[in-house]
Design a protein with these regions (language model features):
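Acidic, proline/glycine-enriched N-terminal capping motif
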Residues: 1-38, 43, 167
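Conserved, structured C-terminal
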Residues: 52-253
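Short, surface-exposed charged micro-motifs
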Residues: 47-49
Length: 253
Protein backbone atom coordinates (compact mmCIF):
# COMPACT_ATOMS: atom_id res chain seq x y z
CA UNK A 1 0.00 0.00 0.00
CA UNK A 2 1.06 3.60 -0.48
CA UNK A 3 1.11 6.02 2.44
CA UNK A 4 1.09 9.77 1.79
CA UNK A 5 1.21 12.47 4.46
CA UNK A 6 0.15 16.03 3.59
CA UNK A 7 0.55 18.99 5.95
CA UNK A 8 -2.88 20.22 7.05
CA UNK A 9 -4.21 23.66 6.11
CA UNK A 10 -7.55 25.11 5.03
CA UNK A 11 -6.13 25.63 1.53
CA UNK A 12 -5.02 21.99 1.29
CA UNK A 13 -8.46 20.89 2.45
CA UNK A 14 -10.13 22.93 -0.29
CA UNK A 15 -7.81 21.50 -2.95
CA UNK A 16 -8.32 17.90 -1.80
CA UNK A 17 -12.08 18.41 -1.90
CA UNK A 18 -11.74 19.19 -5.61
CA UNK A 19 -10.58 15.62 -6.30
CA UNK A 20 -12.37 13.76 -3.48
CA UNK A 21 -16.19 13.75 -3.02
CA UNK A 22 -15.72 13.72 0.76
CA UNK A 23 -16.55 16.38 3.34
CA UNK A 24 -13.09 16.94 4.80
CA UNK A 25 -13.98 20.18 6.58
CA UNK A 26 -16.07 18.32 9.15
CA UNK A 27 -13.64 15.43 9.51
CA UNK A 28 -12.58 15.19 13.16
CA UNK A 29 -8.97 14.72 14.23
CA UNK A 30 -7.99 11.04 13.94
CA UNK A 31 -11.17 10.21 12.00
CA UNK A 32 -10.95 8.28 8.71
CA UNK A 33 -13.19 8.25 5.64
CA UNK A 34 -13.44 5.93 2.65
CA UNK A 35 -13.21 8.01 -0.53
CA UNK A 36 -12.23 8.10 -4.21
CA UNK A 37 -9.86 9.93 -6.51
CA UNK A 38 -12.35 11.15 -9.09
CA UNK A 39 -12.07 11.34 -12.89
CA UNK A 40 -13.75 13.95 -15.11
CA UNK A 41 -16.20 11.37 -16.53
CA UNK A 42 -17.32 10.46 -13.01
CA UNK A 43 -15.10 7.36 -12.98
CA UNK A 44 -12.73 6.36 -10.21
CA UNK A 45 -8.95 6.58 -10.49
CA UNK A 46 -8.65 4.75 -7.18
CA UNK A 47 -10.43 4.22 -3.88
CA UNK A 48 -8.60 5.21 -0.72
CA UNK A 49 -8.77 5.94 3.00
CA UNK A 50 -8.07 9.49 4.16
CA UNK A 51 -7.44 10.29 7.84
CA UNK A 52 -7.35 13.75 9.41
CA UNK A 53 -4.47 13.72 11.88
CA UNK A 54 -3.61 16.62 14.20
CA UNK A 55 -1.41 18.54 11.77
CA UNK A 56 -1.65 16.52 8.55
CA UNK A 57 -3.71 14.22 6.36
CA UNK A 58 -2.75 10.58 5.90
CA UNK A 59 -3.91 8.94 2.66
CA UNK A 60 -3.71 5.17 2.15
CA UNK A 61 -3.57 4.19 -1.54
CA UNK A 62 -3.80 0.86 -3.35
CA UNK A 63 -0.34 -0.48 -4.16
CA UNK A 64 -1.06 -1.03 -7.87
CA UNK A 65 -2.30 2.55 -8.35
CA UNK A 66 -0.13 4.49 -5.93
CA UNK A 67 2.30 6.10 -8.40
CA UNK A 68 -0.48 7.37 -10.67
CA UNK A 69 -2.47 8.50 -7.61
CA UNK A 70 0.54 10.33 -6.24
CA UNK A 71 1.00 12.28 -9.48
CA UNK A 72 -2.69 13.27 -9.55
CA UNK A 73 -2.45 14.58 -5.99
CA UNK A 74 0.86 16.34 -6.69
CA UNK A 75 -0.65 18.13 -9.67
CA UNK A 76 -3.73 19.24 -7.75
CA UNK A 77 -1.73 20.50 -4.78
CA UNK A 78 0.96 21.98 -7.03
CA UNK A 79 3.55 20.21 -4.89
CA UNK A 80 5.96 18.09 -6.91
CA UNK A 81 8.01 17.45 -3.74
CA UNK A 82 5.18 15.47 -2.18
CA UNK A 83 6.20 11.84 -1.99
CA UNK A 84 5.29 8.43 -0.63
CA UNK A 85 6.65 7.50 2.77
CA UNK A 86 8.57 4.33 1.93
CA UNK A 87 9.90 3.96 5.48
CA UNK A 88 6.52 2.75 6.73
CA UNK A 89 4.69 -0.57 6.50
CA UNK A 90 0.97 -1.22 6.84
CA UNK A 91 -0.25 -4.29 8.71
CA UNK A 92 -3.87 -5.41 9.11
CA UNK A 93 -5.23 -7.69 11.83
CA UNK A 94 -8.87 -8.66 11.28
CA UNK A 95 -11.55 -10.79 12.85
CA UNK A 96 -13.56 -11.13 16.08
CA UNK A 97 -10.45 -11.88 18.15
CA UNK A 98 -8.35 -9.04 16.71
CA UNK A 99 -9.15 -6.67 19.57
CA UNK A 100 -8.08 -9.15 22.25
CA UNK A 101 -4.90 -10.18 20.43
CA UNK A 102 -3.81 -6.64 19.58
CA UNK A 103 -4.55 -5.45 23.12
CA UNK A 104 -1.89 -7.91 24.33
CA UNK A 105 0.67 -6.18 22.11
CA UNK A 106 -0.47 -2.54 22.33
CA UNK A 107 -2.34 -1.40 25.45
CA UNK A 108 -5.61 0.56 25.27
CA UNK A 109 -6.14 -0.07 21.55
CA UNK A 110 -9.61 -1.51 22.21
CA UNK A 111 -10.90 1.98 23.09
CA UNK A 112 -10.73 3.02 19.43
CA UNK A 113 -14.03 3.49 17.61
CA UNK A 114 -14.63 2.27 14.06
CA UNK A 115 -12.85 4.43 11.44
CA UNK A 116 -10.91 6.29 14.12
CA UNK A 117 -7.23 6.10 14.96
CA UNK A 118 -4.58 7.19 17.42
CA UNK A 119 -0.83 7.21 17.99
CA UNK A 120 0.58 4.38 20.10
CA UNK A 121 4.07 3.13 20.93
CA UNK A 122 5.78 -0.16 20.07
CA UNK A 123 9.37 -0.79 21.17
CA UNK A 124 9.91 2.96 21.56
CA UNK A 125 8.63 3.65 18.04
CA UNK A 126 5.56 5.75 17.30
CA UNK A 127 2.92 3.83 15.38
CA UNK A 128 -0.56 4.85 14.20
CA UNK A 129 -3.46 2.42 14.56
CA UNK A 130 -6.94 2.79 13.07
CA UNK A 131 -9.93 0.58 13.77
CA UNK A 132 -10.60 -0.34 10.18
CA UNK A 133 -10.00 -2.95 7.52
CA UNK A 134 -11.34 -4.46 4.32
CA UNK A 135 -12.90 -7.71 5.44
CA UNK A 136 -16.28 -6.72 6.89
CA UNK A 137 -15.01 -7.93 10.27
CA UNK A 138 -13.87 -5.92 13.27
CA UNK A 139 -10.20 -5.17 12.86
CA UNK A 140 -7.28 -2.77 12.95
CA UNK A 141 -4.70 -1.38 10.54
CA UNK A 142 -1.29 -0.42 11.81
CA UNK A 143 1.10 2.05 10.17
CA UNK A 144 4.57 1.56 11.60
CA UNK A 145 8.29 1.87 10.72
CA UNK A 146 9.65 -0.86 8.45
CA UNK A 147 12.35 -1.69 11.00
CA UNK A 148 9.82 -3.01 13.54
CA UNK A 149 7.23 -4.46 11.13
CA UNK A 150 8.50 -8.05 11.32
CA UNK A 151 8.82 -8.04 15.11
CA UNK A 152 5.31 -6.57 15.39
CA UNK A 153 3.86 -9.38 13.26
CA UNK A 154 5.81 -11.95 15.30
CA UNK A 155 4.27 -10.49 18.47
CA UNK A 156 0.78 -10.81 16.99
CA UNK A 157 1.43 -14.44 16.03
CA UNK A 158 2.79 -15.22 19.50
CA UNK A 159 -0.46 -13.90 20.99
CA UNK A 160 -2.64 -16.15 18.83
CA UNK A 161 -2.95 -14.48 15.44
CA UNK A 162 -2.59 -16.47 12.20
CA UNK A 163 -1.22 -15.31 8.86
CA UNK A 164 -3.70 -15.35 5.97
CA UNK A 165 -3.37 -14.75 2.25
CA UNK A 166 -5.22 -12.60 -0.25
CA UNK A 167 -7.62 -15.44 -1.05
CA UNK A 168 -9.07 -15.30 2.47
CA UNK A 169 -9.20 -11.51 2.34
CA UNK A 170 -10.94 -11.65 -1.03
CA UNK A 171 -13.60 -14.07 0.20
CA UNK A 172 -14.37 -11.90 3.21
CA UNK A 173 -14.56 -8.63 1.31
CA UNK A 174 -16.83 -10.20 -1.33
CA UNK A 175 -19.21 -11.45 1.36
CA UNK A 176 -19.21 -7.96 2.88
CA UNK A 177 -19.88 -6.32 -0.50
CA UNK A 178 -16.60 -4.39 -0.49
CA UNK A 179 -15.07 -3.42 -3.84
CA UNK A 180 -11.60 -4.28 -5.08
CA UNK A 181 -10.16 -1.70 -7.45
CA UNK A 182 -9.45 -3.04 -10.93
CA UNK A 183 -12.07 -5.76 -10.51
CA UNK A 184 -15.35 -4.29 -9.22
CA UNK A 185 -14.54 -0.64 -9.92
CA UNK A 186 -12.26 1.17 -12.37
CA UNK A 187 -11.82 4.41 -14.31
CA UNK A 188 -15.06 3.78 -16.21
CA UNK A 189 -17.18 2.98 -13.15
CA UNK A 190 -18.74 5.80 -11.15
CA UNK A 191 -19.48 5.60 -7.40
CA UNK A 192 -23.19 5.62 -8.29
CA UNK A 193 -22.85 2.68 -10.71
CA UNK A 194 -20.73 0.86 -8.12
CA UNK A 195 -23.52 1.30 -5.54
CA UNK A 196 -21.12 3.38 -3.44
CA UNK A 197 -23.16 6.57 -3.33
CA UNK A 198 -23.07 6.28 0.48
CA UNK A 199 -19.36 7.19 0.33
CA UNK A 200 -20.15 10.58 -1.23
CA UNK A 201 -20.80 13.05 1.59
CA UNK A 202 -24.41 14.26 1.42
CA UNK A 203 -23.38 17.91 1.57
CA UNK A 204 -21.00 17.38 -1.38
CA UNK A 205 -23.52 15.97 -3.88
CA UNK A 206 -24.43 19.46 -5.11
CA UNK A 207 -20.88 20.74 -4.60
CA UNK A 208 -18.15 21.10 -7.21
CA UNK A 209 -15.51 18.39 -7.50
CA UNK A 210 -14.01 16.55 -10.46
CA UNK A 211 -16.77 14.45 -12.05
CA UNK A 212 -19.51 16.04 -9.92
CA UNK A 213 -21.68 16.99 -12.92
CA UNK A 214 -21.86 13.36 -14.05
CA UNK A 215 -22.43 12.10 -10.51
CA UNK A 216 -25.32 14.50 -9.93
CA UNK A 217 -26.85 13.54 -13.29
CA UNK A 218 -26.67 9.84 -12.47
CA UNK A 219 -28.25 10.36 -9.06
CA UNK A 220 -31.12 12.32 -10.60
CA UNK A 221 -31.69 10.21 -13.74
CA UNK A 222 -30.50 6.77 -12.68
CA UNK A 223 -27.90 4.50 -14.30
CA UNK A 224 -28.03 1.71 -16.88
CA UNK A 225 -25.70 -0.54 -14.89
CA UNK A 226 -25.44 -1.12 -11.14
CA UNK A 227 -23.22 -3.31 -8.98
CA UNK A 228 -25.30 -5.73 -6.90
CA UNK A 229 -24.70 -8.88 -4.92
CA UNK A 230 -25.91 -12.29 -6.09
CA UNK A 231 -26.01 -15.67 -4.39
CA UNK A 232 -25.58 -18.75 -6.63
CA UNK A 233 -28.02 -21.59 -6.01
CA UNK A 234 -25.39 -24.30 -6.54
CA UNK A 235 -21.75 -24.89 -5.66
CA UNK A 236 -20.61 -23.81 -9.14
CA UNK A 237 -18.08 -21.00 -8.83
CA UNK A 238 -19.18 -17.68 -10.32
CA UNK A 239 -15.87 -16.55 -11.75
CA UNK A 240 -14.98 -12.97 -12.59
CA UNK A 241 -16.28 -11.77 -16.02
CA UNK A 242 -18.76 -14.66 -16.30
CA UNK A 243 -21.87 -13.50 -18.21
CA UNK A 244 -25.24 -13.54 -16.44
CA UNK A 245 -28.43 -14.45 -18.36
CA UNK A 246 -32.11 -15.04 -17.82
CA UNK A 247 -34.08 -14.65 -21.08
CA UNK A 248 -31.32 -12.24 -22.13
CA UNK A 249 -27.94 -11.07 -20.94
CA UNK A 250 -28.21 -9.14 -17.67
CA UNK A 251 -24.63 -8.41 -16.78
CA UNK A 252 -21.29 -9.86 -15.70
CA UNK A 253 -19.72 -11.19 -12.55
Amino acid sequence: MGQIFIKYSNDITDKLQEILPTDLKNLKINQSKYSFLMKENGGIYDDLIITRMKDKYMIILNAACKQNDLQIIKNKLNDQNLDMNNDLSLIAIQGPESKTILENVVSNVSKLKFMNGENFSFKNNEIFITRSGYTGEDGFEISLPNKVAISFVEELISKGSTLIGLGARDTLRLEAGLCLYGHDINENTSPVEANLKWAISINRINDNFIGSHQIKKQIEEGVSKLRVGIKPETRVIARESTKIFDERKRGNI
